[in-house]
Curated annotation (Swiss-Prot):
EC primary class: transferase
Pathway stated in the Swiss-Prot or TrEMBL entry: Cell wall biogenesis; peptidoglycan biosynthesis
GO molecular function: pentosyltransferase activity; peptidoglycan glycosyltransferase activity
GO biological process per UniProt: cell wall organization; peptidoglycan biosynthetic process; regulation of cell shape
Membrane topology reported for the UniProt record: Single-pass membrane protein
Localization of this protein: Cell inner membrane
Gene (UniProt): mtgA
Protein name: Biosynthetic peptidoglycan transglycosylase
Organism encoding this protein: Acinetobacter baumannii (strain SDF)
Keyword Cell inner membrane set for record: yes
Catalysis: reaction(s): [GlcNAc-(1->4)-Mur2Ac(oyl-L-Ala-gamma-D-Glu-L-Lys-D-Ala-D-Ala)](n)-di-trans,octa-cis-undecaprenyl diphosphate + beta-D-GlcNAc-(1->4)-Mur2Ac(oyl-L-Ala-gamma-D-Glu-L-Lys-D-Ala-D-Ala)-di-trans,octa-cis-undecaprenyl diphosphate = [GlcNAc-(1->4)-Mur2Ac(oyl-L-Ala-gamma-D-Glu-L-Lys-D-Ala-D-Ala)](n+1)-di-trans,octa-cis-undecaprenyl diphosphate + di-trans,octa-cis-undecaprenyl diphosphate + H(+)
Length: 225
């Protein structure tokens, strides 16, 4: 019995180490190569292979600065200054959730969201959060802030099977993300908390309020050069 427990423990530790090696090697490759798929994209495809994934890569310099400012205003205003974790944001989210008695606010940074999108799944659990933390830590030490934001903008979800700002700009506005206006950029950034719902409810009051807030603060965000 003792030998069996030791063997199972070694298998578990080995599996954990293999996952970390996979994440590490993926981050090394993606540091200089386009990210053409993520775990979230795969999950969407596996759930319904008849629905194609809509995704198109766009280099950082070809994405409108309006969108870069908007996405940080909406998701992570301290992006430039933290090292993957916004402890003030996490503390605020915990306080909000404690007051409401349920999860109504997150504290995830762009880096944490990207780690989850690339390697994990959406269901909340302590195991997933722990792995997200490790992947975020590795990413922040291997990639520049510019690269993190570039990959994030190209892989985040904007609707059903719709990934990346270029695909979103073409879908919602029939134009490239290179020429997004402030209003258009703010709208796309405002979709992110619940893109599949807002895709069919574009006049939702919460969405419109979030868009106005992003417009108000987007010029105060600092983006990577």
């Amino acid at each position: 019995m003792k030998a069996f427990i030791v063997r199972m423990l070694l298998i578990f530790i080995g599996a954990i180490l293999l996952i970390q090696l996979w994440i590490f090697s993926s981050l090394v490759w993606w540091r200089t190569h386009e990210v053409d798929t993520t775990m979230f994209m795969r999950i969407d495809y596996w759930s319904d292979p008849s629905e194609p994934i809509i995704h198109e890569w766009l280099d950082y310099d070809d994405i409108s600065d309006n969108f870069k400012h908007a996405i940080l205003a909406g998701e992570d205003a301290k992006f430039i200054h933290h090292h993957g974790f916004d402890w003030d944001g996490i503390r605020f989210a915990l306080e909000r959730n404690n007051e409401e008695g349920e999860v109504v606010a997150g504290g995830s940074t762009v880096s944490q969201q990207l780690a989850k999108n690339l390697f994990l799944y959406n269901k909340r659990s302590f195991i997933r959060k722990g792995q997200e933390t490790v992947a975020t830590w590795m990413m922040e030490r291997m990639w520049s802030k510019r690269r993190i934001l570039e990959v994030y903008m190209n892989s985040v979800e904007f609707g059903k099977n719709l990934y990346g700002v270029e695909a979103a700009a073409q879908y919602y506005y029939g134009k490239s993300a290179k020429s997004l206006t402030r209003e258009q950029a703010a709208f796309l950034a405002a979709l992110l908390p619940d893109p599949k719902y807002y895709q069919d409810h574009r006049n939702d009051r919460k969405l419109q309020y979030r868009k106005r807030v992003i417009l108000r603060y987007m010029n105060s965000t600092q983006i990577p050069e």
